C-alpha cells in the first residue's frame, strides 16, 4: 500500500542476508507463503523489486535448478532462476505461478557484474527458519563438524585403491571442534 514506516532491526543473519524488522502498523497487506520443496525445474517464477530505484518492477523467468550451492559461499540451498535480477532486486520476493512467495531474491552470478541469466533466491522455508531463530534467540545457530572435506578425484581414487572417483575425503580435522572431540 506504499506506506513508509520506521523499523527496528531485531536481528540479522549475514550468511543468508536475512534481517528481522519490527514495525508498528495495522491492516498491512499479506502475501501467501508457498512451498519451495514442490518446485520443479522449468516452472515459471516472478521477481518483484526496485532495480536501480525503479519501484515495483516485475521480471519473469523459470526455475533453472534447485538446492544450488554457489562457489565460495557458505552452503545455502539456493533456488536458481533465469529471472533478471539487478541492483535493487535483492531482498524482494520470488513468487510461483500461484502468487505465493517461494523465495527471497538474493544475488546473481556474473563475471562482468551485470545480469547474465544466473539469479539465485533463498528458499522461503530457509528464510522463515532464520526469522524464527532471530525472533526466539536473537541469532542463528548452525551445526558444524569442524572438518575440511576434499572431493575424491581420479588421482586420489587411484592413490587409495578406489574403483572410481566418487565421494569425499576428510582432509583435515580442525582442533577443538565437534569432530576433534568425537
What are these regions (language model features)?
Residues 1-181:
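Serine-dependent protease modules
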Amino acid at each position: 500500500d506504499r506506506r513508509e514506516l520506521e523499523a527496528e532491526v531485531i536481528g540479522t543473519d549475514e550468511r543468508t542476508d536475512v534481517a528481522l524488522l519490527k514495525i508498528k502498523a495495522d491492516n498491512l497487506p499479506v502475501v501467501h507463503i508457498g512451498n519451495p520443496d514442490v518446485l520443479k525445474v522449468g516452472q515459471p517464477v516472478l521477481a518483484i523489486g526496485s532495480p536501480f530505484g525503479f519501484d515495483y518492477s516485475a521480471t519473469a523467468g523459470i526455475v533453472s535448478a534447485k538446492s544450488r550451492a554457489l562457489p565460495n559461499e557458505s552452503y545455502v540451498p539456493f533456488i536458481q532462476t533465469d529471472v533478471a535480477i539487478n541492483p535493487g532486486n535483492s531482498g524482494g520476493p520470488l513468487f510461483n505461478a500461484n502468487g505465493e512467495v517461494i523465495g527471497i531474491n538474493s544475488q546473481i552470478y556474473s563475471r562482468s557484474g551485470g545480469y547474465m541469466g544466473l539469479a539465485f533466491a533463498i528458499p522461503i522455508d530457509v528464510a522463515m527458519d532464520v526469522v524464527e531463530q532471530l525472533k526466539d534467540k536473537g541469532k542463528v545457530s548452525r551445526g558444524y563438524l569442524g572438518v575440511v572435506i576434499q572431493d575424491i578425484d581420479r588421482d586420489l581414487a587411484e592413490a587409495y585403491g578406489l574403483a572410481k572417483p566418487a565421494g569425499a575425503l576428510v582432509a583435515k580435522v580442525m582442533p577443538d571442534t565437534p569432530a576433534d572431540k568425537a
